[in-house]
Amino acid sequence: MSSPQLPAFLWDKGTLTTAISNPACLVNVLFFFTPLMTLVTLLILVWKVTKDKSNKNRETHPRKEATWLP
């Protein structure tokens, strides 16, 4: 049995030189990666903000700890 042929790696030298020499291809790549990086950055920021808020909620207030009611 023969194994099926695997496709060539996407970013070989030919593809990279085509992307650099062809401005339309370069613009398409930029329009793809710009929203992707924006989305990743926003997700990281939201994660950090929600993580910080959850840590603040877990901290106990010093006056509440010191107050003992019989």
UniProtKB/Swiss-Prot annotation:
Intracellular or extracellular location(s): Membrane
Transmembrane region(s): 26-46
GO cellular component, one term: membrane
Highest rank taxon of the organism: Eukaryota
First-listed, main subcellular location of the protein, grouped into a coarse class: membrane
Mode of membrane association: Single-pass membrane protein
Entry keyword set: Membrane, Transmembrane, Transmembrane helix
Protein name (database record): Small integral membrane protein 42
Organism: Homo sapiens
Lineage: Eukaryota, Metazoa, Chordata, Craniata, Vertebrata
